Regions:
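Glycine-rich and polybasic anion-binding loops at the starts of cofactor/ligand-binding domains
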Residues: 2-186
Length: 186
């Protein structure tokens, strides 16, 4: 019977994380660190959202501030929410072709091991980099079948009524502190 230490050693937990790298930030927009009503308003204004979405975000922020840290999962008490940046836009627009992505973004996905052949095969994907979807491609066959597959910002702009009806219904902001955080600053 293997001991606990042997099992941990076999997991190779002390080796370097193969995806542990960082790319330099070159955002076209970034909020200041910290979470406040001003931060939420700035995100909403930058995205030119309707008033009801701003109200949704502000209510989610109130929920976030009032909820305790969840007890499930790892130790979370050392998170300093005032030092985090909650919104960073790495590009000025969503790209529909892989070739149109900035080279440093392409390099990131290459380093993550997503080969060109897989990118070409999938074609019905969105890729998020920092706070924004920066690449979106949908197979024409899905669109012909009436499938609506959009990044969140585009969905809000193109289908506001549908969006308002369903957004935040699977995991509502009141579910837990982090659901509320996501709803406030997505």
């Amino acid at each position: 019977m293997a001991t606990k230490n042997t099992k941990i050693k076999n997991l190779n937990l002390e080796s370097a994380y193969q995806f542990g790298f960082a790319m330099p930030e070159r955002p076209v927009f970034k909020t200041a660190p910290g979470l406040s009503e001003q931060t939420v308003r700035e995100i909403s204004a930058t995205k030119a959202e309707p008033a009801w979405m701003l109200q949704f975000r502000l209510q989610a922020l109130k929920t976030f501030l009032s909820k305790p840290l969840p007890q499930w999962g790892g130790e979370l008490t050392e998170i300093n929410f005032d030092t985090l940046c909650y919104y960073l836009r790495p590009a000025d627009q969503v790209r529909k072709r892989w070739q149109d992505l900035p080279p440093d973004v392409q390099k990131t996905f290459d380093r993550l091991g997503i080969p060109e052949a897989e990118r070409q095969y999938l074609q019905g994907v969105s890729a998020q980099y920092d706070s924004e979807v920066i690449y979106h491609s949908l197979q024409a066959t899905l669109a012909k079948q009436g499938v609506i597959f959009l990044d969140t910002d585009t969905a809000l702009k193109k289908y506001p009524d549908l969006f308002k009806e369903y957004f935040g219904t699977v995991v509502p902001p009141a579910d837990n502190k982090f659901a509320a955080l996501n709803s406030a600053v997505w």
